[in-house]
Protein backbone atom coordinates (compact mmCIF):
# COMPACT_ATOMS: atom_id res chain seq x y z
CA UNK A 1 0.00 0.00 0.00
CA UNK A 2 1.22 3.51 -0.67
CA UNK A 3 1.95 5.83 2.28
CA UNK A 4 2.15 9.58 2.54
CA UNK A 5 4.58 11.54 4.75
CA UNK A 6 3.19 13.71 7.49
CA UNK A 7 4.91 16.66 9.16
CA UNK A 8 5.99 14.92 12.25
CA UNK A 9 8.06 12.51 10.37
CA UNK A 10 5.42 9.94 10.51
CA UNK A 11 3.71 8.40 7.55
CA UNK A 12 0.02 8.34 7.01
CA UNK A 13 -1.25 5.21 5.37
CA UNK A 14 -3.15 5.83 2.20
CA UNK A 15 -6.36 4.03 1.66
CA UNK A 16 -6.15 1.07 -0.62
CA UNK A 17 -6.94 1.82 -4.26
CA UNK A 18 -10.26 0.60 -5.32
CA UNK A 19 -10.24 -1.54 -8.38
CA UNK A 20 -11.81 0.10 -11.45
CA UNK A 21 -15.42 -0.69 -11.93
CA UNK A 22 -16.75 -1.72 -15.31
CA UNK A 23 -20.16 -0.42 -16.33
CA UNK A 24 -22.61 -3.07 -17.33
CA UNK A 25 -25.42 -2.36 -19.79
CA UNK A 26 -28.75 -1.85 -18.19
CA UNK A 27 -31.29 -3.98 -20.02
CA UNK A 28 -34.11 -1.73 -18.79
CA UNK A 29 -32.56 1.43 -20.21
CA UNK A 30 -33.47 2.35 -23.80
CA UNK A 31 -30.54 3.17 -26.00
CA UNK A 32 -30.92 5.93 -28.54
CA UNK A 33 -31.41 4.89 -32.12
CA UNK A 34 -28.20 5.36 -34.10
CA UNK A 35 -30.24 6.90 -36.89
CA UNK A 36 -31.58 9.49 -34.43
CA UNK A 37 -28.00 10.69 -33.83
CA UNK A 38 -27.41 11.13 -37.56
CA UNK A 39 -27.62 14.64 -38.97
CA UNK A 40 -30.98 15.64 -40.44
CA UNK A 41 -29.72 15.47 -43.99
CA UNK A 42 -28.49 11.89 -43.52
CA UNK A 43 -31.69 10.48 -42.10
CA UNK A 44 -33.70 8.24 -44.48
CA UNK A 45 -36.94 9.78 -45.65
CA UNK A 46 -40.13 7.97 -44.85
CA UNK A 47 -42.33 7.16 -47.89
CA UNK A 48 -45.18 9.59 -48.49
CA UNK A 49 -48.63 8.43 -47.52
CA UNK A 50 -50.56 6.75 -50.35
CA UNK A 51 -52.91 8.98 -52.33
CA UNK A 52 -56.58 8.39 -51.68
CA UNK A 53 -58.23 6.23 -54.33
CA UNK A 54 -60.90 7.95 -56.47
CA UNK A 55 -64.49 7.07 -55.77
CA UNK A 56 -65.89 4.26 -57.93
CA UNK A 57 -67.78 5.30 -61.07
CA UNK A 58 -71.52 4.74 -61.11
CA UNK A 59 -72.67 1.75 -63.17
CA UNK A 60 -73.53 2.47 -66.81
CA UNK A 61 -77.21 2.40 -67.69
CA UNK A 62 -78.42 -0.74 -69.40
CA UNK A 63 -79.36 1.19 -72.54
CA UNK A 64 -75.84 2.59 -72.92
CA UNK A 65 -74.27 -0.82 -72.39
CA UNK A 66 -76.60 -2.41 -74.91
CA UNK A 67 -75.92 0.33 -77.46
CA UNK A 68 -72.16 -0.01 -77.13
CA UNK A 69 -72.40 -3.78 -77.38
CA UNK A 70 -74.39 -3.49 -80.60
CA UNK A 71 -71.84 -1.04 -82.03
CA UNK A 72 -69.03 -3.44 -81.15
CA UNK A 73 -70.79 -6.31 -82.86
CA UNK A 74 -71.36 -4.19 -85.96
CA UNK A 75 -67.70 -3.19 -86.17
CA UNK A 76 -66.60 -6.79 -85.66
CA UNK A 77 -68.58 -7.80 -88.76
CA UNK A 78 -67.13 -5.06 -90.96
CA UNK A 79 -64.39 -5.93 -93.44
CA UNK A 80 -60.81 -5.05 -92.42
CA UNK A 81 -60.13 -1.33 -92.63
CA UNK A 82 -63.74 -0.20 -92.34
CA UNK A 83 -63.71 0.50 -88.60
CA UNK A 84 -60.80 2.96 -88.88
CA UNK A 85 -62.38 5.15 -91.56
CA UNK A 86 -64.60 5.17 -94.60
CA UNK A 87 -65.55 1.80 -96.00
CA UNK A 88 -66.18 1.28 -99.70
CA UNK A 89 -67.55 -2.22 -100.29
CA UNK A 90 -67.21 -3.95 -103.61
CA UNK A 91 -69.80 -2.92 -106.19
CA UNK A 92 -71.97 -5.40 -108.06
CA UNK A 93 -75.14 -5.88 -110.06
CA UNK A 94 -78.06 -5.89 -107.64
CA UNK A 95 -80.31 -7.57 -110.20
CA UNK A 96 -78.29 -10.78 -110.29
CA UNK A 97 -80.23 -13.53 -108.54
CA UNK A 98 -83.26 -11.30 -107.87
CA UNK A 99 -85.43 -12.11 -110.87
CA UNK A 100 -88.36 -13.26 -108.65
CA UNK A 101 -88.19 -9.90 -106.81
CA UNK A 102 -88.52 -7.89 -110.03
CA UNK A 103 -91.97 -6.82 -111.23
CA UNK A 104 -93.57 -4.44 -113.75
CA UNK A 105 -97.01 -2.87 -113.75
CA UNK A 106 -97.48 -3.69 -117.48
CA UNK A 107 -96.00 -6.35 -119.78
CA UNK A 108 -97.13 -7.17 -123.27
CA UNK A 109 -98.42 -10.63 -124.21
CA UNK A 110 -98.91 -12.09 -120.73
CA UNK A 111 -102.53 -13.16 -121.40
CA UNK A 112 -102.54 -13.47 -125.19
CA UNK A 113 -100.28 -12.51 -128.11
CA UNK A 114 -100.37 -8.76 -128.76
CA UNK A 115 -99.03 -6.76 -131.71
CA UNK A 116 -96.65 -3.85 -131.20
CA UNK A 117 -94.82 -1.51 -133.55
CA UNK A 118 -91.34 -0.03 -133.29
CA UNK A 119 -91.11 3.64 -134.21
CA UNK A 120 -87.48 3.40 -135.30
CA UNK A 121 -88.48 0.78 -137.88
CA UNK A 122 -90.98 2.97 -139.74
CA UNK A 123 -88.71 3.16 -142.75
CA UNK A 124 -88.11 -0.56 -142.79
CA UNK A 125 -90.25 -3.19 -144.41
CA UNK A 126 -91.30 -4.84 -141.14
CA UNK A 127 -92.51 -2.35 -138.60
CA UNK A 128 -94.86 -4.32 -136.33
CA UNK A 129 -94.25 -7.55 -134.42
CA UNK A 130 -96.00 -9.99 -132.09
CA UNK A 131 -95.38 -10.12 -128.33
CA UNK A 132 -96.10 -13.46 -126.66
CA UNK A 133 -94.91 -13.49 -123.04
CA UNK A 134 -97.00 -16.40 -121.83
CA UNK A 135 -93.81 -18.44 -121.66
CA UNK A 136 -90.32 -17.29 -120.65
CA UNK A 137 -87.87 -16.11 -123.26
CA UNK A 138 -85.84 -18.74 -125.10
CA UNK A 139 -83.30 -17.88 -127.77
CA UNK A 140 -84.38 -20.89 -129.86
CA UNK A 141 -88.05 -21.56 -129.23
CA UNK A 142 -89.64 -18.33 -127.92
CA UNK A 143 -87.93 -15.11 -128.96
CA UNK A 144 -91.21 -13.15 -128.83
CA UNK A 145 -91.38 -13.19 -125.02
CA UNK A 146 -90.64 -9.82 -123.39
CA UNK A 147 -91.07 -10.42 -119.68
CA UNK A 148 -89.52 -8.14 -117.07
CA UNK A 149 -86.81 -10.68 -116.17
CA UNK A 150 -85.33 -10.10 -119.63
CA UNK A 151 -83.67 -6.94 -118.25
CA UNK A 152 -81.27 -9.06 -116.18
CA UNK A 153 -77.72 -9.22 -117.44
CA UNK A 154 -76.97 -12.75 -118.63
CA UNK A 155 -74.26 -14.51 -120.59
CA UNK A 156 -76.72 -16.13 -122.99
CA UNK A 157 -75.95 -15.91 -126.72
CA UNK A 158 -77.25 -12.74 -128.39
CA UNK A 159 -78.45 -11.10 -125.14
CA UNK A 160 -79.58 -7.93 -126.93
CA UNK A 161 -82.37 -9.88 -128.61
CA UNK A 162 -84.20 -10.11 -125.27
CA UNK A 163 -85.83 -7.10 -123.61
CA UNK A 164 -88.85 -6.13 -121.56
CA UNK A 165 -91.76 -4.32 -123.17
CA UNK A 166 -94.96 -2.84 -121.78
CA UNK A 167 -98.38 -2.98 -123.41
CA UNK A 168 -99.29 -0.48 -126.08
CA UNK A 169 -101.30 2.50 -124.89
CA UNK A 170 -100.66 1.95 -121.15
CA UNK A 171 -99.39 5.00 -119.25
CA UNK A 172 -97.60 5.44 -115.92
CA UNK A 173 -95.80 2.11 -116.18
CA UNK A 174 -93.43 1.31 -113.31
CA UNK A 175 -90.76 -1.27 -112.53
CA UNK A 176 -90.22 -2.41 -108.94
CA UNK A 177 -87.28 -4.32 -107.42
CA UNK A 178 -87.34 -5.66 -103.86
CA UNK A 179 -83.74 -5.80 -102.58
CA UNK A 180 -84.78 -7.33 -99.20
CA UNK A 181 -82.02 -5.30 -97.49
CA UNK A 182 -80.33 -1.90 -97.37
CA UNK A 183 -77.67 -1.11 -99.96
CA UNK A 184 -75.52 1.85 -100.91
CA UNK A 185 -76.96 2.54 -104.36
CA UNK A 186 -74.39 4.11 -106.68
CA UNK A 187 -75.84 4.20 -110.19
CA UNK A 188 -78.46 2.79 -112.55
CA UNK A 189 -77.86 1.84 -116.18
CA UNK A 190 -80.89 1.71 -118.49
CA UNK A 191 -80.62 0.80 -122.17
CA UNK A 192 -83.70 1.43 -124.29
CA UNK A 193 -84.61 -0.70 -127.28
CA UNK A 194 -86.26 2.24 -129.07
CA UNK A 195 -86.50 5.96 -128.46
CA UNK A 196 -86.62 6.99 -124.85
CA UNK A 197 -90.13 7.73 -123.56
CA UNK A 198 -91.03 11.42 -123.36
From Swiss-Prot:
It is found in: Secreted, Extracellular space, Extracellular matrix, Basement membrane. Residues 45-61 have a biased composition (Pro residues). Coiled coil: none annotated. Residues 1-64 are annotated as: Disordered. Residues 83-198 form the Laminin N-terminal domain. Residues 23-38 have a biased composition (Basic and acidic residues). Its main location: secreted. Keywords: Basement membrane, Cell adhesion, Disulfide bond, Extracellular matrix, Laminin EGF-like domain, Secreted. InterPro entries: Laminin/Netrin_ECM (IPR050440), Laminin_N (IPR008211). One of its GO terms (biological process) is cell adhesion. GO terms for cellular component: basement membrane; extracellular region. Laminin is a complex glycoprotein, consisting of three different polypeptide chains (alpha, beta, gamma), which are bound to each other by disulfide bonds into a cross-shaped molecule comprising one long and three short arms with globules at each end. PANTHER family: LAMININ SUBUNIT BETA-2 (PTHR10574:SF36), NETRIN/LAMININ-RELATED (PTHR10574). Binding to cells via a high affinity receptor, laminin is thought to mediate the attachment, migration and organization of cells into tissues during embryonic development by interacting with other extracellular matrix components. This is Laminin subunit beta-1 variant. It comes from Gallus gallus.
